[in-house]
Amino acid sequence: MVANVCEEAIGLKVQLPIQRMTYAEAMDRFGSDKPDTRFGFELVDVSEVVANCGFGVFTGALENGGSVRGINIKGQAEMPRKKIDALVEFAKGYGAKGLAYLSVMPDGTYKSSFAKFMTEEELQALVSAMGGEAGD
């Protein structure tokens, strides 16, 4: 009924059925109880990939029963440091201690806050688990 009203009143075609998900699914996939699914920024659990790496932030989180999750922001490998710092501050506003980032540069090298603590194989496994490629 609401879909018909929208179409009749303002010409907006509502695609049915409307996607629904449980609170638990929303929190697990997007980290929010009101996710914006338009952009595909789903959390990827990489806990198994980083479980034995030398980066204390990751291993500490796992030892305390937490998880390590990431978001692949396609095509943003060359995001300016100022913007990354703004994202860190945004995350801190929601209770995070910080953010770790890994960019795969167009030439295949890595720009990261933690790459020096991981082997090349671990970094490749992490990029693969995240569905990353050069430029991400």
Each language-model region and where it sits:
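Class II aminoacyl-tRNA synthetase catalytic cores and aaRS-like
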Residues: 1-136
